[in-house]
Amino acid sequence: MNILQLGAPSAVLPSTATVQVGEGNDIRKGQAGDVAMGAAFNYLFKKEFPGSQITFMNCRKKFSKNDIDVINQYDVLIVSGGGLFLYDTFENNESDWQWGISEELLEQISIPIIVYAVGYNKFRGQRNFNSRFDKTVKVLVEKSLFFSVRNSGSGDAIKKHIPEYLHEKINLNFCPTMLLNEKYKLKHQTTNSVGFVLAGDRLSNRHKNIKQFSGEIKKFTDYLSKIGKKTILINHEHDTWSQNQIQFDDIIDLFQADARKTYETYSNMDTVVCDRGHAQMIPFSLGCKILTPISHNKLKWFLDDIQLNEFGIEENDSELGNKLIKQYMLQQKLDWENIYTDRMNKIKQLYLKNMNFIKAQLSDLNLN
């Protein structure tokens, strides 16, 4: 089966690029979460569709009729991964999200479409999507063999842009980064380390009062130091800004690192304080406790889906530091291993259910 994977690469690719996907050829390089996501999709394709030829196409371009002709030469199109429903990473007049395609051209795609674990990533305070978003997403949902989002909140948000009769086509399907440790088989280690991933991009969108936020995080790191914990600042990309305001015991740079290093790093963390999506998902998938200063709705949505929303605190809460301390202390009293095992089993069961559905649909079309 010839699969075309459409997505947004972290690496700088020409907008016209199509790249063969395989070992040693990862089109996502740079931001640690994106690298992990690329590796997770590569692993997923190899495991579930052995022998298939996978080609990656950059979605961040203005698509033409020629591009549709190229797409239609493949057996199936998989729109995959990440927060594609966001306009500011590739502003365009075609769709108002990261795939620069008009509704008219979407209609001309003749091969089966699978939308796999995408996210509604509009930041708080950003303008609403325009009518082109509504039109293209409606067509995409209509045409999709399977349409899935990586958290329920994204699904609820998408439903506001499409007719009610399409709502039943929206499925929850967690990001495949949550299952990539199947490949690495890393065991979570008991340590006294607390990692901090404090996103450094779009600071004005994330924080109403950056000085207050830094002060509250410092209150928490001071507490951790007093009780003998090692605080480690972790950089996914642009995430070292806080070291000027907060003293950490160590810094680990995962920018440009391969996915295995990211997973190895988190397997040696007891707790991760995170306001990036993959800095929630990957550590949790390895057994880490997670605490989240919520600066984006997707962070809350993930916690809602794993039924741990008490461990998310709004970033502009004037008592953020004290609440982090309180929730950290609470986590130490919980049977976290049991919580982790229960949630991961549910995530795996949902993955299997969705993948079995996808394979059945493809089989009905004589694609396998």
Task: Label the predicted regions.
Residues 1-368:
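Active-site anion-handling motifs in enzyme catalytic cores
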